A protein has these predicted regions:
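N-terminal pre-catalytic segment of deacetylase/amide-hydrolase enzymes
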Residues: 2-100, 106-114, 119, 265-268, ...
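Catalytic grooves of carbohydrate-active enzymes
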Residues: 243-280
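Metal-dependent polysaccharide deacetylase catalytic core of the NodB/CE4 family, i.e.
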Residues: 94-97, 107-109, 118-250
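Short acidic donor-binding/metal-coordinating loop in glycosyltransferase active sites
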Residues: 101-103, 253-254
Length: 284
């Protein structure tokens, strides 16, 4: 049997009404109708394959294919993050940098890093895990006293993308808030960074419900392994080639390489015309 060409659904219906099939032909025709109906149901109107559901996202990722000193593409756009009050960069087009540090423990570098920030008059944000407040209260107080933001990096550093219950999510943040209050005597700023960048869209919604701004990053490098620290030259090349307008820079407070290069990094960026702002200056 020679099968007719199938066009739009209306044409298919008209064709079927005029079609007088034999037994086998009827079976084939029914199969075609079913397959067409399924395709119409699952394909979006533009004919393109649908993207994976946002709830499936579990790791923050960046694509630097746009080239040197260009804002990388996040696996969730800043426009989409705006819906949840979250950021990975400042897309206003100004020559500004937001410097942030993550830490779960102290490795003897925080004092040197704070000294450089004080000397260069650069504001920063420190996203700390619960253990840091318990073991380094003096350093936490110094961060706050010198004008830096201390943000919430959770209490136990879990994979937050696996936490769907709001009460469990809240517990991870509230326990850190309590530790901050005990150490500083004040309320914790409402900035949150997911451990290891693991998250789901529901996590963004949960953080927003709790009054938090979720802060990802647009520039980082492999600096977290204390047994495999990058060389000074590698670190400077990697960071300088990828710095861009509105960058939110993530460095690890435990990195001896970061402590070594920070002053050179900051002065170099200042020479390029960059200014440094606190996270409170981020605007949607």
């Amino acid at each position: 049997m020679k099968l007719p060409k199938i066009g739009k659904p209306k044409k298919l219906i008209k064709l079927l009404r005029s079609f007088k099939p034999s037994g086998i032909e009827a079976m084939i025709a029914c199969g075609l109708v079913f397959a067409t109906a399924v395709m119409i149901a699952i394909l979006p109107k533009n004919g393109k394959t649908a993207a994976p559901a946002a709830s499936e996202i579990t790791d923050w990722g960046l694509n630097f294919s746009r080239g040197k000193n260009k804002t990388p593409t996040g696996n969730v756009s800043q426009k989409e993050l705006d819906k949840y009050g979250a950021f990975y960069c400042d897309d206003e087009g100004e020559k500004v940098i937001y410097l942030t540090f993550d830490a779960g423990y102290e490795n003897g570098c925080a004092g040197q890093i704070l000294d450089v920030l004080k000397k260069e008059q650069v504001p920063a944000a420190f996203f700390l895990v619960g253990n840091y407040f318990k073991t380094q209260p003096e350093l936490v107080r110094r961060m706050v006293e010198e004008g830096h933001i201390v943000g919430n990096h959770t209490t136990t550093h879990p994979d937050m993308s696996k936490i769907s219950d709001l009460s469990d999510f809240r517990k991870e943040l509230e326990q850190t808030e309590n530790l901050y209050r005990e150490v500083t005597g004040s309320e914790m700023p409402k900035f949150y960074r997911p451990p290891q960048g693991k998250f789901s869209i529901s996590n963004l919604q949960q953080a927003q419900m709790l009054g938090y701004t979720t802060v990802f990053w647009s520039l980082a490098y492999a600096d977290w392994d204390n047994t495999k620290q990058p060389t000074k030259e590698f670190a400077l090349e990697k960071l300088n080639s990828r710095i861009h307008d509105g960058a939110i820079v993530l460095l690890h407070l435990t990195s001896k390489t970061n402590a070594e290069i920070l002053e050179e990094l900051i002065t170099g960026w200042k020479e390029q015309g960059y200014t440094f702002k606190p996270l409170t200056e981020l605007k949607h």
